[in-house]
Amino acid sequence: MATGWVVLIAVIALLVGAAGGFFLARKYMQDYFKKNPPVNEDMLRMMMASMGQKPSEKKVRQMMQQMKNQGK
């Protein structure tokens, strides 16, 4: 009977730990994306304009493709 209780408690602890880890990781990622949003085309245009470059559509798409390839 004691072995059954140990197994039951271990399974419950595993489930609680997995659920807790999931929600903690989810909260962390939500906060991270709130502080550091992913770069999009509008942000690239603003960055290029602030550097004194004329943000043509071709340049913006090239930079987005380079950033996507760099992440791989």
UniProtKB/Swiss-Prot annotation:
User: Does Cytoplasm count among this protein's keywords?
Assistant: no
Topology in the lipid bilayer is annotated as: Single-pass membrane protein
- Give me the Gene Ontology terms describing cellular component: plasma membrane
Say if the entry is tagged with keyword Transferase. Answer: no
Which residues are listed as membrane-spanning?
Answer: 4-26
Q: Which UniProt keywords apply?
A: Membrane, Transmembrane, Transmembrane helix
Q: Which top-level group of life is the source organism from?
A: Bacteria
The record's section on InterPro entries has: UPF0154 (IPR005359)
* The protein, known as: UPF0154 protein EF_1734
